Amino acid sequence: MGTAKLPALLWLLAGVVLALAVNPAHGAKTRHYDFFITETNYTRLCHEKSILTVNGQFPGPTIYARKGDLVIVNVHNNGNKNITIHWHGVDQPRNPWSDGPEFITQCPIRPGGNFTYQVILSEEEGTLWWHAHSDFDRATVHGAIVIHPKRGTTFPFKKPDKEIPVILGEWWNDDIEHVLDKAQLLGGDVDPSNANTINAQPGDMFPCSRDDTFKVAVQQGNTYLLRIINAGLTNDMFFAIAGHRLTVVGIDARYTKPLTVDYIMIAPGQTMDVLLEAKRTLGSNSRYYMAARTFITLPLDTIPFNNSTATAIVEYTDSVTARPVGPPEFPVQLPAIKDENAAMAFVTQLRSLGNQEHPVHVPTHVDEHMLIDIDINVLPCDPTNMAEKCKEGPQGNRFAASLNNVSFQSPAIDVLDAYYYSSGHGVYEEDFPNKPTAFVDPPVNNGSGPLMTKRGTKVKVLEYGTVVEVVFHDLSSENHPMHLHGFAFYVVGRGNGTFDESRDPATYNLVDPPFQNTVSVPRSGWAAIRFRADNPGVWFMHCHFDRHVVWGMDTVFIVKDGKTPQAQMLPRPPNMPQC
């Protein structure tokens, strides 16, 4: 049942209340940004093409704020296609209207139109990011969100001498819209990108790239905070810096116990705050590669994939220790493309900080248990024009994906409006299953090919305050980065093989598990998360491999209003885009 409707005048009043609520006396501010979506020519790998950008920048502008601020972003669509923007990892308390996923919480912003997002920062502190949430547009429409501690507080680690956003991404020589259209027409997988990138540059190992390679100037003895974001569409990535170790101090804008490692593995959608100490041996090399390499779990002979390594250069510039030399040193500790043991060894070491200023509150009593199978499937081809369709699909079908054997179908109007106006009937069904409709054990398809699934717009409705445990159970042969809008969650467990309800919960970490918004579920394995459904609204959950979103590896949580005004969804803004 939807929330009661309020006229525009009451929305204006609610906006005043909202500003007061997020700007109390402790010094939080309202910050304003204008984003202009435009087509801009860029050249990479000797190819020039027109791409969608924000303010002509690729990556887009960085948003700077402090914990608890309100960020107002007016998005002007001067491009040639519909678009929306999502504020990835921002909980948006009571405010799904500004969350951004197309046809989930809003209709897209049409060319020539604009929409003003109210980005409510609450408990987030660290690095997040924003990106387009329509089609494959986020390949070039994305940027960092840097959230500093509240005034009067500081980092729970030594203050860095400098902060550096490091955005990992991908570049296609072809128009990204053509890449998506081709895959949908032919029913096959998406063509792999032509290069991985670091801050939109592939690095000097690629043609026509040497002069523009991203460089980081450092001085001996200084500490640098790298704000690392995986903005890629299709790949997990390993990241390392030659001659240096890295200390992870945060993930998804929540602090972690300091973890010093030789490399990190970061999934699409995830962010990590990493300290780099510039401590090289005197007289040694003064130039070092930072490198980002694809991590893939699929059999390498099954699909085309991007086997590239993006590079940037860390250069010591202080006169006492620096000496120009030949080529930069390469990070020999960077794991191989299919090193699953290295990936698991890294992610299982992450722990929440859990101090007095940043406590851990893991729910110990669970109200709603969900076991969600993740799978790659097929759907029948459109019987019309068979000569052109499904030429590249498996066994004459087209690729699909599912959660609990339901391949999500986006509605013609957004789910949030349908819920708000109590008109969900005919738009969505409230029967997303808590368990798989067809359970497969062992969690592989035994080489017989993908299984047929079914389409549906099924959502899961939760009472306000419900404690939810979701066990993601991966039936496929690749990892899946599962992202939940509107919440951070505790990753209480993970493992290989089939999840055992009688045995595996005993292995959970309920003391200091990492607090994330995106979790990498291991292939043919499982990951368990817990969260409290105390944010009323409509919230998307999906794989952050974008082709899997298009294929249907998604669902929606609807969290009902609580009893008090502070536990109820904000009213609908009067200027929402129309479908």
Swiss-Prot record:
Database matches in InterPro entries: Cu-oxidase-like_N, Cu-oxidase_2nd, Cu-oxidase_C, Cu-oxidase_fam, Cu_oxidase_CS, Cu_oxidase_Cu_BS, Cupredoxin, CuRO_1_LCC
Keywords: Apoplast, Copper, Glycoprotein, Lignin degradation, Metal-binding, Oxidoreductase, Repeat, Secreted, Signal
Amino acids binding Cu cation 3: H133, H485, H542
Entry cofactors: Cu cation
Chief localisation class: secreted
Domain Plastocyanin-like as annotated: residue spans: 36-152, 162-319, 436-563
Cofactor: record remark: Binds 4 Cu cations per monomer.
GO terms (BP aspect): lignin catabolic process
Intracellular or extracellular location(s): Secreted, Extracellular space, Apoplast
Entry similarity comment: Belongs to the multicopper oxidase family.
Protein name as catalogued: Putative laccase-9
Organism this protein belongs to: Oryza sativa subsp. japonica
